[in-house]
Amino acid sequence: MKTLVLLSALVLLAFQVQADPIQNTDEETKTEEQPGEDDQAVSVSFGDPEGSSLQEESLRDLVCYCRKRGCKRRERMNGTCRKGHLMYTLCCR
């Protein structure tokens, strides 16, 4: 059940990332790595207002990052992110 919820959240996150309008400016189209570019945080929360077993501590706040180079310690690879034509690794903890 937890796996199903996690996968559903990741699918919804992927749809949201693809649906966001992309604004191309000169700064955004540079392929050079900018400071802090590896740490694009995405926060995902689970649960309903009345409370359920899904609101356990491990599922309450799932924080994901789109990283250029592999995941850091305590993070797991959960898929890919796309910003424009560039692909990133989706790392969650």
Swiss-Prot record:
<feature type="disulfide bond">
    <location>
        <begin position="64"/>
        <end position="92"/>
    </location>
</feature>
<dbReference type="GO" id="GO:0005615">
    <property type="term" value="C:extracellular space"/>
</dbReference>
<keyword id="KW-0044">Antibiotic</keyword>
<keyword id="KW-0732">Signal</keyword>
<feature type="disulfide bond">
    <location>
        <begin position="66"/>
        <end position="81"/>
    </location>
</feature>
<dbReference type="GO" id="GO:0071222">
    <property type="term" value="P:cellular response to lipopolysaccharide"/>
</dbReference>
<keyword id="KW-0929">Antimicrobial</keyword>
<feature type="disulfide bond">
    <location>
        <begin position="71"/>
        <end position="91"/>
    </location>
</feature>
<dbReference type="InterPro" id="IPR016327">
    <property type="entry name" value="Alpha-defensin"/>
</dbReference>
<keyword id="KW-0964">Secreted</keyword>
<feature type="propeptide">
    <location>
        <begin position="17"/>
        <end position="58"/>
    </location>
</feature>
<feature type="region of interest" description="Disordered">
    <location>
        <begin position="22"/>
        <end position="56"/>
    </location>
</feature>
<dbReference type="GO" id="GO:0009410">
    <property type="term" value="P:response to xenobiotic stimulus"/>
</dbReference>
<dbReference type="Pfam" id="PF00323">
    <property type="entry name" value="Defensin_1"/>
</dbReference>
<feature type="signal peptide">
    <location>
        <begin position="1"/>
        <end position="16"/>
    </location>
</feature>
<dbReference type="InterPro" id="IPR006080">
    <property type="entry name" value="Beta/alpha-defensin_C"/>
</dbReference>
<keyword id="KW-0211">Defensin</keyword>
<dbReference type="GO" id="GO:0050829">
    <property type="term" value="P:defense response to Gram-negative bacterium"/>
</dbReference>
<protein>
    <recommendedName>
        <fullName>Alpha-defensin 3</fullName>
    </recommendedName>
</protein>
<comment type="similarity">
    <text>Belongs to the alpha-defensin family.</text>
</comment>
<keyword id="KW-1015">Disulfide bond</keyword>
<dbReference type="Pfam" id="PF00879">
    <property type="entry name" value="Defensin_propep"/>
</dbReference>
<dbReference type="GO" id="GO:0042742">
    <property type="term" value="P:defense response to bacterium"/>
</dbReference>
<dbReference type="InterPro" id="IPR006081">
    <property type="entry name" value="Alpha-defensin_C"/>
</dbReference>
<dbReference type="GO" id="GO:0050830">
    <property type="term" value="P:defense response to Gram-positive bacterium"/>
</dbReference>
<comment type="function">
    <text>Probably contributes to the antimicrobial barrier function of the small bowel mucosa.</text>
</comment>
<dbReference type="InterPro" id="IPR002366">
    <property type="entry name" value="Alpha-defensin_N"/>
</dbReference>
